[in-house]
């Protein structure tokens, strides 16, 4: 059982996931500070110096901090955008699957063309076909 666990943990996917979670945790604090200390004040500057985190609604003793929710949405959008950019950059350097499939499809098409040419040559040249049949008979 210990050996199986070691194999499971040693697989690339598990290690990649662990690294992703650790880096994601560290990245979250960077994005939060970016949003809280740069983006929100910048947005507040354009809409009259309003800080979203101060927006609250109090109803019958309950406090709804929808400004904090707006900050969370901004955090999410920034993280999603940065991940999108990172994926685009990584995909730029990886070979495209479509190109590989196109190359394989082209090779198959070329093979079919050659086979059709051979077939047509045999059909149009009965002498060649009979020579091939004679060679087959002599090897038996």
From Swiss-Prot:
The keyword Ion transport applies. It comes from the Bacteria. One of its GO terms (cellular component) is plasma membrane. InterPro entries: Mechanosensitive_channel_CS, MS_channel, MSC/AndL, MscL_channel. Homopentamer. Belongs to the MscL family. Channel that opens in response to stretch forces in the membrane lipid bilayer. May participate in the regulation of osmotic pressure changes within the cell. This is Large-conductance mechanosensitive channel. It comes from Pediococcus pentosaceus (strain ATCC 25745 / CCUG 21536 / LMG 10740 / 183-1w). The gene is mscL.
């Amino acid at each position: 059982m210990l050996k199986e666990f070691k194999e499971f943990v040693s697989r690339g996917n598990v290690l990649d996931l662990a690294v992703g979670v650790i880096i994601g945790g560290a990245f979250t604090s960077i994005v939060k500070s970016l949003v809280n200390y740069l983006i929100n004040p910048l947005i507040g500057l354009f809409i009259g110096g309003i800080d979203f985190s101060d927006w609250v609604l109090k109803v019958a003793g309950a406090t709804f901090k929808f400004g904090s929710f707006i900050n969370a949405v901004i955090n999410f959008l920034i993280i999603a955008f940065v991940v999108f950019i990172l994926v685009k950059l990584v995909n730029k350097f990886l070979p495209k699957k479509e190109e590989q499939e196109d190359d394989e499809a082209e090779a198959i098409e070329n093979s079919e063309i050659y086979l059709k040419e051979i077939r047509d040559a045999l059909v149009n040249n009965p002498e060649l076909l009979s020579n091939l049949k004679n060679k087959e008979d002599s090897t038996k």
